[in-house]
C-alpha cells in the first residue's frame, strides 16, 4: 500500500513537474514576444516621429508655395490694372498739344468774327 501511494505521489510530482516546465517554457516565449513587441513599438515611435517631422516640413513648404503663388497672382493683377489705367488715361484725357491749340482757335475765330 505504501508502494502504491508512493508511486501515485511520484506520478503526481512528475505531472506537476511537467506542467511547471510547460509553464516556464511559455513564460520564456512570452518574454521573447514581449521583447519583440517592445522593439516594434520603439520602431513605430521612431517612424511616427519621422512622419510628424516630414509632414510639418511639407506643410511649411506648401504654405510658402501658396504665399509665393498669391504674391505672383497679386503682381499680375496689379500689372493688368496698371495697364488698363494707363490705356484709359491715354484715351480719355486730352493731350496737352491738342487741347491748348483747339480752344485758341475757337477763341480766335470768335474774336475776329463778323461782330468785331
Curated annotation (Swiss-Prot):
Entry keywords, A to Z: Cell membrane, Coiled coil, Developmental protein, Differentiation, Golgi apparatus, Membrane, Myogenesis, Phosphoprotein, Transmembrane, Transmembrane helix
Gene3D superfamilies: 1.20.5.110
Transmembrane segments: 73-93
Induction: During myogenesis.
CC annotations in GO: cell surface; cytoplasmic vesicle membrane; extracellular exosome; intercalated disc; late endosome; organelle membrane; perinuclear region of cytoplasm; plasma membrane
Membrane topology designation: Single-pass type IV membrane protein
UniProt-listed GO biological process terms: cell differentiation; Golgi to plasma membrane protein transport; muscle organ development; skeletal muscle tissue development
Modification type Phosphoserine: residues: 41, 48-49
Post-translational modification remark: (Microbial infection) Targeted and hydrolyzed by C.botulinum neurotoxin type X (BoNT/X) which hydrolyzes the 40-Arg-|-Ser-41 bond and probably inhibits neurotransmitter release. It remains unknown whether BoNT/X is ever produced, or what organisms it targets.
Keyword Phosphoprotein: yes
Vesicular side: 94-116
Disordered, as annotated region: 96-116
Domain v-SNARE coiled-coil homology: start-end pairs: 5-65
Compartments reported by the entry: Cell membrane; Endomembrane system; Golgi apparatus, trans-Golgi network membrane
Stated role: May participate in trafficking events that are associated with myogenesis, such as myoblast fusion and/or GLUT4 trafficking.
Protein name per Swiss-Prot or TrEMBL: Vesicle-associated membrane protein 5
Name of the gene: VAMP5
